[in-house]
């Protein structure tokens, strides 16, 4: 909202399949469904604006990264701002999820459901904090797809906002992907956030103190790219 207001831009939020509902719905997600969601969102963006700026967080960043290497999947995108992009989770054994019997092994080790405690009312309201562990399989598959993507041929300028203290995803891979990125790019490491995991590094729920600063950083970057 803050970025769109500052740029006087139209704004469209997309909701990836399975998200924003109850825990059971999370199992409905798939890599193909999320790619379709992304392409639909870009089509809407092209319809309501002259240029499309993508702001992608966490596994949304995985999706935007893969799409940036597929010309037909990122047509019309002028820039991408990544916030804590997911190029590999830190959870031990995550790579087993996409192996044969990955779902069965995950359920045997961790149970059929995953959950985490919420930290405040906004966290409780806007996060799905209990869901089938099977819902993590497409997340891992998309993460692997993004990490293996030939980002050297990316032509879309990118801004990577992340924390080296991220306890959820691997910041070393963010630095690696940025180093391989074929188009102009910038790294914005963030040290102090409100999130104890240093993953949700902006937003009223977990990191309100950094929201304004990071929104302004994105605005300055976009204006420099677009000559505003």
Role assignments for model-derived ranges:
Residues 4-22:
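Conserved alpha/beta-hydrolase
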Residues 156, 169-180:
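Short alpha-helix in the alpha/beta-hydrolase fold that links the catalytic acid
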Residues 154, 160-162, 166:
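Short beta-strand/loop motif that positions the catalytic acidic residue
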Residues 55-64:
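Gly/Ala-rich beta-loop-alpha elbow adjacent to hydrolase catalytic centers
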């Amino acid at each position: 909202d803050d970025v769109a207001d500052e740029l006087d831009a139209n704004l469209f939020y997309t909701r990836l399949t399975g998200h924003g509902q109850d825990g059971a719905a999370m199992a409905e997600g798939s890599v193909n469904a999320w790619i379709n969601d992304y392409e639909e969102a870009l089509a809407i963006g092209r319809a309501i604006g002259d240029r499309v700026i993508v702001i992608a967080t966490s596994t949304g960043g995985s999706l935007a990264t893969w799409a940036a290497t597929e010309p037909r999947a990122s047509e019309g995108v002028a820039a991408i701002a990544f916030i804590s992009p997911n190029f590999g989770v830190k959870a031990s054994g995550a790579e087993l999820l996409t192996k044969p019997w990955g779902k069965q092994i995950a359920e045997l080790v961790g149970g059929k459901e995953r959950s985490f405690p919420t930290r405040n009312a906004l966290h409780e309201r806007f996060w799905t904090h209990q869901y089938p562990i099977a819902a993590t399989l497409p997340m891992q598959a998309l993460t692997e797809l993004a990490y293996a993507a030939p980002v050297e041929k990316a032509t879309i300028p990118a801004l990577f906002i992340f924390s080296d203290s991220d306890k959820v995803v691997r910041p070393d891979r963010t630095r690696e992907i940025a180093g391989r990125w074929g188009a102009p790019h910038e790294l914005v490491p963030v040290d102090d956030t409100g999130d104890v995991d240093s993953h949700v590094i902006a937003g009223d729920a977990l990191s309100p103190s950094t929201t304004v600063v990071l929104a302004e950083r994105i605005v300055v970057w976009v204006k420099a790219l677009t000559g505003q």
